[in-house]
Amino acid sequence: MATLPITKRGAEKLKAELHNLKTVQRPWVINAISEARAQGDLSENAEYEVAKDRQGFIEGRIQEIEGKLSAAQVIDPTTFETGTRVVFGSTVKLEDEATGDSVTYQIVGEDEADIKLGLVNIGSPIARALIGKDEGDSAEVQAPGGIRRYEIVTVLYI
């Protein structure tokens, strides 16, 4: 499996989810299966089927998270030397050159991305356009409405 970049905050979030799945969700579903079995005939036992489906989901998610964490390259942007270059984990303030509107994004791994929170996937068009550029540079981004040009106003490692 290839190395997956993830921020320290993203890795901590995955570890917390894994802990919850193993210590809360898994024991709960095992108990639910046990209670459903105690009701007798399993062929028409909806509670049993639901619990078994839930168990399959939980076990699959545990394996998925463990795989991601084992392949993760955890990057803590607060440890970067002060600079002006856009890299994975950096927070970038942009200004739309056409409208003057400002927007701030942090470049994160795919599991962390949430555009509503300003977290953009390293593989997204905007992140690919920004990586390697410096404060004061312009970046062209292919957006659904056409090409947009942004000026990189500030780069922070927070």
UniProtKB/Swiss-Prot annotation:
Pfam families: GreA_GreB, GreA_GreB_N
Gene Ontology molecular function: DNA binding; RNA polymerase binding
InterPro entries: GreA/GreB_C_sf (IPR036953), TF_GreA/GreB_CS (IPR018151), Tscrpt_elong_fac_GreA (IPR006359), Tscrpt_elong_fac_GreA/B (IPR028624), Tscrpt_elong_fac_GreA/B_C (IPR001437), Tscrpt_elong_fac_GreA/B_fam (IPR023459), Tscrpt_elong_fac_GreA/B_N (IPR022691), Tscrpt_elong_fac_GreA/B_N_sf (IPR036805)
Gene Ontology terms: biological process: DNA-templated transcription elongation; regulation of DNA-templated transcription elongation
Transmembrane segments: none
Domain of life: Bacteria
Coiled coil: none
Family annotation (Gene3D superfamilies): Transcription elongation factor, GreA/GreB, C-terminal domain (3.10.50.30), Transcription elongation factor, GreA/GreB, N-terminal domain (1.10.287.180)
PROSITE patterns named in the record: GREAB_1
Assigned keywords, A-Z: DNA-binding, Transcription, Transcription regulation
Similarity remark: Belongs to the GreA/GreB family.
Described purpose of this protein according to its UniProt entry: Necessary for efficient RNA polymerase transcription elongation past template-encoded arresting sites. The arresting sites in DNA have the property of trapping a certain fraction of elongating RNA polymerases that pass through, resulting in locked ternary complexes. Cleavage of the nascent transcript by cleavage factors such as GreA or GreB allows the resumption of elongation from the new 3'terminus. GreA releases sequences of 2 to 3 nucleotides.
Protein known as: Transcription elongation factor GreA
Top-level taxonomy: Bacteria, Pseudomonadati, Pseudomonadota, Betaproteobacteria, Burkholderiales
Gene: greA
